[in-house]
């Protein structure tokens, strides 16, 4: 009787559990369409945004996302301008001839969000390839969203986007200059990076491991599981290198890329080939084990010098110099090989735990706008040298320097634009300001290396520095500014209004935040005189833009 009561009790408990499970399934089914659509939209935007971040190369690690739009009644005029400009730019996300539908009730989004959503919307309904260029993994890796669009159409669409974005801020005298495209818009990225990770078990090792497991199982069965086995080597796995798939950390193997320098790509593949010989394990970011995390190759456009940085999960690197010599033997273009240590569980590629040269001087030199620049693993240097020279020369031209002016280079970084300006006219005085001490150290070294004496570099917040200059009654003729993707802060723009430079030349990698800031400067008494886009990253939706303003 006790057993029967126990069985009835157990049966009742099972029935209750089944009923509860059915109720949960029904509840999930009711919510499923709404939840799926919402999460899908978020996923698409996230994937597109990650792909877009990848296309902007040298900027992506140093620049942060724009702050979210203000929605409260008490938001500042500065935040309101951001929303107004996003609405004015409403429909530029799609690739030329592409179709991207806007969801009903969707808020106006920033230019980068629209571009990301446009790319994420590609798939079965992607525009037909009309450029004659193709890549077997272009839809998977997301590095070249517009590869199938003829280059002339890409330029025309980017030009139209800038005219529509800045049109409301212009007057009848504002010059909309034609976009500066590339003559040869392929293989232009002179900084190429690849992660290294373990892939599938090599087939012959898989078969060998299966046989070992079977033998161990048979032995264990014979002695009741008491047999202990010696530790054996793990089966070998493929080594993956290439690009991350859009919005993921899944590596898409690529032996060639139409955007990346071919020498750099060949070196990355040579590293993969040498790793088994030197027993170098690729880093597994899930297990947090392995040794080689990334390799970064920088190629000097004018000099042809090559810097290879190996990012390792630990300092101890047995046979490191032999590895470097063998790599140089296979790729004689290499000038120097550097080991950078990063043991942190982070998405940051380069570490700050130590660095040493395994071969060569540990840096390379390259020429830009007639000046020589020293480039190390941590140096900021634009990834498209051809268009960088165009960008800087146009910016200095728009500054209209005739001699004797005082120029303030805000967000100066390693001093490239300021040095070009200092070298462009007689008796020009240039002051470069940046809050990153290491960048200022590089800027001073670049000035000394080039013998440029009419420039000084200061470690300070640019906005605070300008406010102090205004308080002392000092005068600036021209302000050069190249802020991060988030644009200038409200405090910085107030400082510009207080200092009142006669001319402002604003370089931006994010025209949406640039338009917002230009609108604020316009309210402070400045007039937009010229807009000049530069196509720094062909076959992507990204646009670099220069605005000139006069007060």
Give residue spans per PLM region.
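Rossmann-like S-adenosyl-L-methionine
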Residues: 2-9, 16, 27-31, 35, ...
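Intrinsically disordered, Lys/Arg-rich low-complexity segments
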Residues: 2-114
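Terminal, basic amphipathic appendages of nucleotide-handling enzymes
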Residues: 71-75, 81, 103-147, 225
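Extended interfacial segments that mediate partner engagement and assembly in macromolecular machines
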Residues: 129, 133, 139-284, 302
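Core structural elements
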Residues: 183, 289-302
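Nucleotide donor/acceptor-binding cores
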Residues: 190, 304-306, 404-405
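Solvent-exposed residues in well-ordered beta-strands and their adjoining turns
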Residues: 195-199, 298, 311-313, 550
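Short, aliphatic-rich beta-strand segments
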Residues: 297, 303-313, 372-376
């Amino acid at each position: 009787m006790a057993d029967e009561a126990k069985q009835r009790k157990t049966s009742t408990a099972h029935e209750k559990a089944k009923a509860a499970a059915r109720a949960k399934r029904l509840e999930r089914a009711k919510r499923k369409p709404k939840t799926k659509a919402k999460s899908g939209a978020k996923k698409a935007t996230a994937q597109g945004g990650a792909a877009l971040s990848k296309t902007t190369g040298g900027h992506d690690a140093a620049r942060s996302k724009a702050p979210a739009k203000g929605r409260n009644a008490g938001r500042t005029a500065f935040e309101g301008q951001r929303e107004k400009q996003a609405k004015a730019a409403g429909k530029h996300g799609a690739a030329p001839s592409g179709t991207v539908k806007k969801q009903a009730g969707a808020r106006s989004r920033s230019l980068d969000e629209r571009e990301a959503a446009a790319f994420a919307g590609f798939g079965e309904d992607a525009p037909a390839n009309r450029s004659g260029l193709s890549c077997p993994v272009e839809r998977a890796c997301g590095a070249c969203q517009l590869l199938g669009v003829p280059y002339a159409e890409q330029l025309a669409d980017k030009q139209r986007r800038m005219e529509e974005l800045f049109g409301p801020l212009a007057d009848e005298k504002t010059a909309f200059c034609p976009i500066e495209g590339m003559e040869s818009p392929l293989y232009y990225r002179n900084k190429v990076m690849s992660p290294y990770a373990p892939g599938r078990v090599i087939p012959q090792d898989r078969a060998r491991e299966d046989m070992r497991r079977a033998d161990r199982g048979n032995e264990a069965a014979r002695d009741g599981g008491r047999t202990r086995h010696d530790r054996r080597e793990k089966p070998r796995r493929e080594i993956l290198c290439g690009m991350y798939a859009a919005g993921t950390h899944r590596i898409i193997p690529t032996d060639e890329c139409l955007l990346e320098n071919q020498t750099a790509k060949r070196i990355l593949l040579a590293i993969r080939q040498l790793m088994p010989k030197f027993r170098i394990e690729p880093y597994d970011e899930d297990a947090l084990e392995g040794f080689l995390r990334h390799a970064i190759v920088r190629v000097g456009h004018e000099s042809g010098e090559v810097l290879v940085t190996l990012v390792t999960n630990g300092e101890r690197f047995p046979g490191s110099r032999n590895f470097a010599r063998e790599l140089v033997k296979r790729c004689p273009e290499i000038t120097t090989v550097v080991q950078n240590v990063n043991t942190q569980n982070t998405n940051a590629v380069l570490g700050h735990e130590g660095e040493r040269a395994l071969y060569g001087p540990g840096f390379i030199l390259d020429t830009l706008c007639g000046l020589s620049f020293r480039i190390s693993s941590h140096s900021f240097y634009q990834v498209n040298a051809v268009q960088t020279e165009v960008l800087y020369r146009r910016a200095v031209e728009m500054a209209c320097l005739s001699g004797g002016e005082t120029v303030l280079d805000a967000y100066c970084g390693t001093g490239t634009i300021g040095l070009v300006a200092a070298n462009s006219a007689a008796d020009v005085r240039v002051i470069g300001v940046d809050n990153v001490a290491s960048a200022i150290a590089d800027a001073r070294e670049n000035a000394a290396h080039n013998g440029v004496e009419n420039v000084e570099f200061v470690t300070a917040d640019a906005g605070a520095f300008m406010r102090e200059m205004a308080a002392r009654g000092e005068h600036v003729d021209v302000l050069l500014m190249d802020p991060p993707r988030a644009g200038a802060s409200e405090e910085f723009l107030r400082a510009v209004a207080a200092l009142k430079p006669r001319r402002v030349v604003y370089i931006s990698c994010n025209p949406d935040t640039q338009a917002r800031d230009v609108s604020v400067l316009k309210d402070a008494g400045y007039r937009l005189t010229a807009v000049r886009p530069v196509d720094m990253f062909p076959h992507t939706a990204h646009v670099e833009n220069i605005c000139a303003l006069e007060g």
